[in-house]
Amino acid sequence: MKKKINPQAMQIADYLHDWLEHYVPSIKACSPHTKRNYKISVKLYVEFLRVIKGTTPETLSAECFCMEYIMEWIIWLKENRGCSPATCNVRLSALRVFLKYLSFRDISYMSVFLQAENVPNEKNSKRKVIGLSKQAVDVLLSMPNQGSTIGFRDYTLMLLLYSTAVRINELLTLKDRKSTR
């Protein structure tokens, strides 16, 4: 005998699929890493609902995204999965983005989104970043053989990364707007 699927569960599942497969990659223009984090965060929330709250995919509803459940999820992430406050905030942010999309697609989910927005972020202590000394930077920049083409390329790339503080992935994804290639 087939289980009766809650119509709201089907609607949420459809919106979730559309959000992950269409909205996030194209409209929101997120990186594959961000998309992967969003997917992991939602999977963890669904796992929490299944394991702790006894909610199955067939019984999913708007009530599953209430403020109380989300706050319990954050505690579950910390206690059962060993997540740091920073990781909990990333997971919470991903869930909020989905719920915002959900409320955009169907106004009846607006209260769910607003409840999620009111869940406080976890407090995390800022780690002091210890930079490299001038001598260490000089040693690093002197490593590539600037006499060769590849060495000069590497030196230029290292210098650009250092002077702009851009991440290598960000630099590699830059596109030339005027390029006709």
Question: What are the residue ranges of the model-derived segments?
Answer:
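Conserved catalytic core of the tyrosine transesterase superfamily
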Residues: 1-181
